[in-house]
């Protein structure tokens, strides 16, 4: 369907949990989070009802996120049920891949088509520091397994932070020359824990691109969040997601469902609607989703204000 600004909204990002098996420095506090009561989070049946209703309004792309979606039991069943909705054409997942190696075959059989893997360092000790305990070898094995079963293109999402991992930019770029792997560099955002790092850690996409004159621009869809480039010898592309220096609101095609059941029309807006109040009434649910999508804000103002208006942390919304 179209929002009131004429944008086609066909993409729903679903955070199935706010819990995670890592504690990335820009996402979660070091002590972790307080576990929510079961009644305060969306059950699979409720998530499926929202996905089904959204599909009736023109949503045909679903991405499951977290927290970390793979820590939830039976996530493959939710993917399978979603894949049986005829109008859903693409099901993807964003994961830290710690648990992916042993699950990726079943996930693919269930209907998962693509994975984005959050990976902010290729160095074992640094990865452990950024994630506060993660084992990078599990991620590497998951990538190898995913490639071996034809789960591609695989995209790696990398949040670049000055003084923390910006010396690895070339190493990440070179992955696209060796493997059928896309890399997405994401600007650090002043949201949640990222606020603490933003002043000293922010690097613009433009600064990175300007230092690599051999990058070749690649044509992108209007709704893409990334500006795409590649090297002459690249197997896949290199993307730059630039919410701070070059926002992509004019072509935004997505809304977000949080693990608590709130529908956020914009990642950086404080406006959201609690759909848990409507999942027992199909018509009311459909109407509320329709209303929320239609009233999606024209744009965020994070560039001007240097801070997200969202009151939620990234692990609650889904990155």
Curated annotation (Swiss-Prot):
E.C. numbers: 4.1.99.22
Keyword Kinase attributed: no
Chain ranges of the Radical SAM core domain: 4-227
MF-aspect GO terms: 4 iron, 4 sulfur cluster binding; cyclic pyranopterin monophosphate synthase activity; GTP 3',8'-cyclase activity; GTP binding; metal ion binding; S-adenosyl-L-methionine binding
Annotated catalysed reactions: GTP + AH2 + S-adenosyl-L-methionine = (8S)-3',8-cyclo-7,8-dihydroguanosine 5'-triphosphate + 5'-deoxyadenosine + L-methionine + A + H(+)
GO biological process, one term: Mo-molybdopterin cofactor biosynthetic process
Cofactor descriptive note: Binds 2 [4Fe-4S] clusters. Binds 1 [4Fe-4S] cluster coordinated with 3 cysteines and an exchangeable S-adenosyl-L-methionine and 1 [4Fe-4S] cluster coordinated with 3 cysteines and the GTP-derived substrate.
Binding positions for S-adenosyl-L-methionine per the UniProt entry: 26, 67, 118, 189
Cited SUPFAM superfamilies: Radical SAM enzymes
Pathway assigned to this chain's UniProt record: Cofactor biosynthesis; molybdopterin biosynthesis
Positions contributing to [4Fe-4S] cluster 1 binding: 20, 24, 27
Top-level enzyme category: lyase
Keywords of this entry: 4Fe-4S, GTP-binding, Iron, Iron-sulfur, Lyase, Metal-binding, Molybdenum cofactor biosynthesis, Nucleotide-binding, S-adenosyl-L-methionine
Pfam families: Fer4_12, Mob_synth_C, Radical_SAM
Cofactor(s), by name: [4Fe-4S] cluster
Binding site for [4Fe-4S] cluster 2: 249, 252, 266
HAMAP family in alphabetical order: MoaA_B
Purpose: Catalyzes the cyclization of GTP to (8S)-3',8-cyclo-7,8-dihydroguanosine 5'-triphosphate.
Family from the record: Belongs to the radical SAM superfamily. MoaA family.
Subunit structure: Monomer and homodimer.
Protein name in UniProt: GTP 3',8-cyclase
Origin species: Clostridium botulinum (strain Hall / ATCC 3502 / NCTC 13319 / Type A)
